[in-house]
Amino acid sequence: MAKGRRDNRKKDDKPNSGLIERTVKIKRCAAVVKGGRRFSFAAMVVCGDGKGKVGWGYGKANEVQPSVEKANKQAMRSMVKVPIVDGAIPHRVDGRFGAARVVLLPAGPGTGIIAGSAVRAVCEACGLKNILTKSFGSNNPVSYTHLTLPTIYSV
């Protein structure tokens, strides 16, 4: 009987109606306390509809799954429209964030997404099909996600 009641409960999340969600980074942090180490997790997620809207979120929790869920909710709330022309960006654009630098170039049909992992996640989520990218100055995927989204928005 108790099981039947659980099955009838409403889910607290709405179905994400075809959104593309990419987990860019999951980070484990340790706080040293009297009894040992206490771990917490942080997740960065990029979310988009594949038709020009994309956003990112950063969530923290004591377990991995709640941190990813928090990041997803934040990413859905922060979605912004990106201009896409024939599956590519309209023109070349450069961006900087801290030491990281990225160059985004439009590419011809059939090229695909030529990018590193963090930049690729953003491009796939927003629906870009043909783009060339080059990243300089950092290896941190969180920095590149921070950098790529405002750079694409500025087009």
Map each language-model feature to its residues.
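Single conserved hydrophobic/aromatic residue that forms the stacking wall/gate
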Residues: 146-155
